[in-house]
């Protein structure tokens, strides 16, 4: 969170404040951005599934209107979350990233996973509640490791078939039940490129709301083995010199930060700051 944006559980029964509207097509935006006067937004003909109070931006309360479908609003259009990450104000992206995670959770937890009965929204904590089961469901967070493997002035970068053409990045993967982040790192590296690592160093973390990952970032040194790419997961993987890198991930991502940080340290440059 930033000084401008703090999360909070707010009662939707209160009035006023700002609101964002999210549909399966993205967030509603106009020439001023994605934050709208809440009272005005609620007067539009929107197909609202639920409303959640999500925090404060510049001291003002912010609410999420999660929509069943996208509606036409004069002077507005729909924009995906990734575009906000790549462009514009990063603090606004943080608001929308949090809203997207809460909206996804609210949409997916309308019914109890145990008995199938409708769940009700609790306004004093971030939870959905099933009264027959006395079951509370909280927003999902999926821990994932992401690692830059280094070998002196070389870094190991790979690309997935899902990547933008030409872009190479670090290795990453979800933690399994019972694993530590370090154990996940070792396993994922073995699975994806079949090499061994040592001297695992935690660097930092970043929320990745696509849809609900918590990325735990590491540097690790190459310890042995030859690259063998995992079929269907890795399209190409190779060692690159810090002096001659391929196209890299977006500048606001932790993947890019891990790369830029190592390059800066090897070349004696000013270290970058991880976007929080």
Curated annotation (Swiss-Prot):
<dbReference type="GO" id="GO:0006734">
    <property type="term" value="P:NADH metabolic process"/>
</dbReference>
<keyword id="KW-0862">Zinc</keyword>
<dbReference type="GO" id="GO:0000287">
    <property type="term" value="F:magnesium ion binding"/>
</dbReference>
<feature type="binding site">
    <location>
        <position position="115"/>
    </location>
    <ligand>
        <name>Zn(2+)</name>
    </ligand>
</feature>
<feature type="binding site">
    <location>
        <position position="255"/>
    </location>
    <ligand>
        <name>substrate</name>
    </ligand>
</feature>
<dbReference type="GO" id="GO:0005829">
    <property type="term" value="C:cytosol"/>
</dbReference>
<feature type="domain" description="Nudix hydrolase">
    <location>
        <begin position="139"/>
        <end position="262"/>
    </location>
</feature>
<dbReference type="InterPro" id="IPR050241">
    <property type="entry name" value="NAD-cap_RNA_hydrolase_NudC"/>
</dbReference>
<feature type="short sequence motif" description="Nudix box">
    <location>
        <begin position="173"/>
        <end position="194"/>
    </location>
</feature>
<protein>
    <recommendedName>
        <fullName>NAD-capped RNA hydrolase NudC</fullName>
        <ecNumber>3.6.1.-</ecNumber>
        <ecNumber>3.6.1.22</ecNumber>
    </recommendedName>
</protein>
<dbReference type="GO" id="GO:0035529">
    <property type="term" value="F:NADH pyrophosphatase activity"/>
</dbReference>
<keyword id="KW-0520">NAD</keyword>
<comment type="function">
    <text>mRNA decapping enzyme that specifically removes the nicotinamide adenine dinucleotide (NAD) cap from a subset of mRNAs by hydrolyzing the diphosphate linkage to produce nicotinamide mononucleotide (NMN) and 5' monophosphate mRNA. The NAD-cap is present at the 5'-end of some mRNAs and stabilizes RNA against 5'-processing. Has preference for mRNAs with a 5'-end purine. Catalyzes the hydrolysis of a broad range of dinucleotide pyrophosphates.</text>
</comment>
<dbReference type="GO" id="GO:0019677">
    <property type="term" value="P:NAD catabolic process"/>
</dbReference>
<feature type="binding site">
    <location>
        <position position="192"/>
    </location>
    <ligand>
        <name>a divalent metal cation 3</name>
    </ligand>
</feature>
<dbReference type="GO" id="GO:0000210">
    <property type="term" value="F:NAD+ diphosphatase activity"/>
</dbReference>
<feature type="binding site">
    <location>
        <position position="138"/>
    </location>
    <ligand>
        <name>substrate</name>
    </ligand>
</feature>
<dbReference type="GO" id="GO:0110153">
    <property type="term" value="F:RNA NAD-cap (NMN-forming) hydrolase activity"/>
</dbReference>
<dbReference type="Pfam" id="PF00293">
    <property type="entry name" value="NUDIX"/>
</dbReference>
<feature type="binding site">
    <location>
        <position position="188"/>
    </location>
    <ligand>
        <name>a divalent metal cation 2</name>
    </ligand>
</feature>
<feature type="binding site">
    <location>
        <position position="130"/>
    </location>
    <ligand>
        <name>Zn(2+)</name>
    </ligand>
</feature>
<keyword id="KW-0464">Manganese</keyword>
<feature type="binding site">
    <location>
        <position position="188"/>
    </location>
    <ligand>
        <name>a divalent metal cation 3</name>
    </ligand>
</feature>
<feature type="binding site">
    <location>
        <position position="112"/>
    </location>
    <ligand>
        <name>Zn(2+)</name>
    </ligand>
</feature>
<dbReference type="InterPro" id="IPR015376">
    <property type="entry name" value="Znr_NADH_PPase"/>
</dbReference>
<feature type="binding site">
    <location>
        <position position="133"/>
    </location>
    <ligand>
        <name>Zn(2+)</name>
    </ligand>
</feature>
<dbReference type="InterPro" id="IPR049734">
    <property type="entry name" value="NudC-like_C"/>
</dbReference>
<dbReference type="GO" id="GO:0006742">
    <property type="term" value="P:NADP catabolic process"/>
</dbReference>
<dbReference type="Pfam" id="PF09296">
    <property type="entry name" value="NUDIX-like"/>
</dbReference>
<dbReference type="GO" id="GO:0008270">
    <property type="term" value="F:zinc ion binding"/>
</dbReference>
<dbReference type="Pfam" id="PF09297">
    <property type="entry name" value="Zn_ribbon_NUD"/>
</dbReference>
<keyword id="KW-0479">Metal-binding</keyword>
<comment type="similarity">
    <text>Belongs to the Nudix hydrolase family. NudC subfamily.</text>
</comment>
<feature type="binding site">
    <location>
        <position position="125"/>
    </location>
    <ligand>
        <name>substrate</name>
    </ligand>
</feature>
<feature type="binding site">
    <location>
        <position position="192"/>
    </location>
    <ligand>
        <name>a divalent metal cation 1</name>
    </ligand>
</feature>
<feature type="binding site">
    <location>
        <position position="233"/>
    </location>
    <ligand>
        <name>a divalent metal cation 3</name>
    </ligand>
</feature>
<comment type="subunit">
    <text>Homodimer.</text>
</comment>
<feature type="binding site">
    <location>
        <position position="82"/>
    </location>
    <ligand>
        <name>substrate</name>
    </ligand>
</feature>
<dbReference type="GO" id="GO:0030145">
    <property type="term" value="F:manganese ion binding"/>
</dbReference>
<dbReference type="InterPro" id="IPR015375">
    <property type="entry name" value="NADH_PPase-like_N"/>
</dbReference>
<feature type="binding site">
    <location>
        <position position="172"/>
    </location>
    <ligand>
        <name>a divalent metal cation 1</name>
    </ligand>
</feature>
<dbReference type="InterPro" id="IPR000086">
    <property type="entry name" value="NUDIX_hydrolase_dom"/>
</dbReference>
């Amino acid at each position: 969170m930033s000084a401008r944006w703090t999360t909070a559980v707010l009662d939707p029964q209160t009035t006023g404040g700002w609101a964002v509207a999210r549909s399966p097509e993205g967030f509603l935006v106009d020439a001023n951005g994605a934050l709208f006067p809440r009272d005005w937004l609620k007067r539009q003909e929107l197909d609202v599934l639920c409303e959640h109070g999500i925090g404060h931006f510049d001291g003002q309360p912010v609410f999420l209107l999660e929509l069943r479908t996208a509606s036409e609003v004069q002077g507005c259009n729909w924009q995906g979350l990734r575009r906000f990450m790549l462009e514009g104000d990063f603090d606004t992206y943080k608001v929308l990233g949090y809203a997207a995670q809460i909206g996804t959770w609210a949409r997916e937890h309308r019914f109890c996973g145990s008995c199938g009965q409708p769940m009700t929204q609790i306004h004093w904590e971030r939870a959905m509640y099933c009264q027959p089961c006395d079951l509370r469901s909280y927003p999902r967070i999926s821990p994932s490791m992401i690692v830059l493997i280094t070998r002196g002035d070389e870094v190991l970068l790979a690309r997935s078939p899902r990547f933008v053409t030409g872009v190479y990045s670090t290795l990453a993967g979800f933690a399994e039940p019972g694993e530590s982040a370090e154990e996940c790192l070792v396993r994922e590296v073995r699975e994806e490129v079949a090499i061994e690592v040592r001297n695992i160093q935690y660097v930092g973390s970043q929320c990745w709301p696509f849809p609900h990952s918590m990325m735990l970032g590491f540097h690790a040194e190459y310890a042995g083995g030859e690259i063998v790419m995992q079929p269907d997961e890795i399209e190409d993987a190779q060692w690159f010199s810090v002096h001659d890198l391929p196209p890299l991930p977006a500048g606001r991502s932790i993947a890019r930060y891990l790369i830029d940080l190592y390059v800066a340290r090897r070349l004696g440059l000013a270290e970058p700051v991880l976007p929080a």
